Amino acid sequence: DQQSDSSLDDGSDVPYPFTSCDELIALCEKHHMSIADIVWANETAMQSAVQVRSELDNVWRVMRRCVQHGCHTSQTVLPGGLNAPRRAPKMYARLASNSDVLARDKKRADAVLESSDAAWVDLFALAVSEENAGGGRIVTAPTNGAAGIIPAVLHYYWHFVDHANEEGVITFLLTAGAVGYLFKRNASISGAEVGCQGEVGTACSMAAAGLCAVMGGTPQQVENAAEIGIEHNLGLTCDPVG
């Protein structure tokens, strides 16, 4: 399952074409719209609102099932010759004190924060990464190699932010999609081409933008969050160490 980046490259079929973040922010300011609003308008110019919403809901559904399966699987060792153990189920049991936080589906009071919220974000990302390594169903967000980051941050929003709701999830995905589109159009999201900065860096930038948006950030603040997300991944390669 792949998130759509169908705000067309030439912009010919959308009401708010943009090819850079400067252009995107200018559109937001001119039309008094959020980044998510801009992307929604562009997407619904090419297909029905019902179809766009259905596809976004499906992305979120697959992400949730992926995290849930990664945290509950009975498989103890990942396939392949390395005999790498799955760590997410034990980590989940420890953080949730052997209860089922994911099944109860809400919120901060249901979770035991043994160290920090970051431990839960780590868990969610690890669960997706292990599902990917085990041949499970994931969302390429934006790639297989970086598939854990966006679901992890989105699950943090869903489970630990008091005002989280379904509309916020849609806003998150639309905003993240705009950032991913700009990276794909102007640079690369391919680890084989530009190293891990192109995969993990892009995913980090997308997730930062999405979280900033659902926490009430302005388009300028969302842009800044996205920039900080990629800045600290620039130069990150995929070279093996050891």
Question: Residues of each region from the PLM?
Answer:
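Mobile "lid/hinge" segments at catalytic clefts and subdomain interfaces of large enzymes
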Residues: 1-47, 218-221, 225-230, 234-242
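Generic recognition of cysteine residues
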Residues: 21, 28, 66, 71, ...
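Accessory "access/gating" subregions that flank catalytic or transport cores
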Residues: 46-195
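Hydrophobic alpha-helical bundle architecture
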Residues: 164, 175, 183-242
